[in-house]
Amino acid sequence: MAIIKYKIEFFSNWHCSSGLAAGADVDTLVIKDDNNLPFIPGRTIKGLLRDAMREVIGYNDLTPEKINELFGYNNDKDSYYKKGCVSFTNATLDKSEINTIVKNNLSSFLYKSFTSTAIDENGIAKDSSLRSIETVVPRPLQNSLFKICSFHHIFVPLTFASDYRINFW
């Protein structure tokens, strides 16, 4: 089994939802670990990369079959599932950064909330439209994917809508 390390660089605030709210303060919270630190679940990264690879089918001989081999295949019609040959761990802050943040109780500085409201055609705020979202300030996240099959030359730096980039090494 081989290990490929990856790093996600963010160029703006980001949000990976926990599905939870903070009462009247924030409608949507960022997913956090036990130390109140942000992370992105491995399954989320796997899904993002699967979708990105579907966008570049044909590049470097990338085919739908190779994507299915890497990420797995699910046929709801036949209730058939085949596990892929790559497995992703959660993307987290660098270990030294985690230690510093936890030791000095700095996790609150990683987050910024934004509030917005819907405006009608007359420039007036719509009733009950005030929303607030918690975001994470740009910090790189990293971790590993484990490959248990043979593939090469398909992972390249991927940039998504100029907000973040994933580099593999």
Segment roles from a protein language model:
Residues 1-117, 123-169:
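RNA-binding basic/glycine-rich loop and surface signature characteristic of RAMP-family CRISPR effectors
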